[in-house]
Amino acid sequence: MADIIPNISIDVALFGFKGIKLEVLLIKRDKKPEMDQWSLPGGYVYMDESIKDAAKRRLKELTGITKLYLSQIALFGDTNRYPTRRLVSVLFCALIKPEQFKLIAGSDAKDVEWFKVSELGKLPFDHNEMISTAMLWFKNEIWREPIFINLLPEKFPLNQMQNLFTQFLGEAIDNRNFRKKVISQELVEKLNEKTKGGQQRPAFLYKLKRTI
């Protein structure tokens, strides 16, 4: 086994959307410090691998998830962020459809589960701050890049897309303005189909344009 790079680690904030609430993937730690606490998946970097490869490796070892595009978005280096020694962490993030991946806890993870971002309690280390940082990064990118493409189903009503945007932006969006903006930017294509069932009036379905 290759030696690790001392004092450098990675953490991954992985978000999923099941149609209603935005969720983040956490592992139940099987080692000290913070044994049995839920935290972001992460770990050390080997001397013979890149930072991003370390993030992909640890995500696979801890959760079973593979073949993701990870964005490197921030560096966390407060002197007291880790209890036993000075440790700098590189934060990566990604968006996925949870139903497309089978979760398998491994390595030093006892369990792995999705948690609603809006209902998170206090997490170990600075992981709450990491999640907030990732959310802010997505907020700044959401109109510039179609990052939401990995979260929406193939067909969806516009209110589902609007709900997703609202959770990233952290504020309510006017229905008419939202509809006008996504159509003017040619992000979606209207289908000749409507939602079925439920108590609400049927709404037209849309799909993301293939050019995205």
Question: Predicted regions: what is each one?
Answer:
Residues N163-A172:
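Short helix-coil junctions and helix-kink-helix linkers
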Residues C93, L103-F138, L151-N159, N177-E186:
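NUDIX/MutT-family hydrolases
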Residues M1-W38:
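N-terminal strand-loop-strand
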Residues L191-I212:
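Long, intrinsically disordered, low-complexity Ser/Thr/Pro-rich regulatory/activation regions
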Residues S9, L25-I27, P33, L40-I51, ...:
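Active-site-proximal cofactor/substrate-binding loop regions of enzyme domains
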Residues A2-I10, D53-K56, L62-K102, E141-F148, ...:
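Active-site segment of metal-dependent pyrophosphate-handling enzymes
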Residues E145-E154, F168:
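Conserved helix-adjacent loop modules within structured domains
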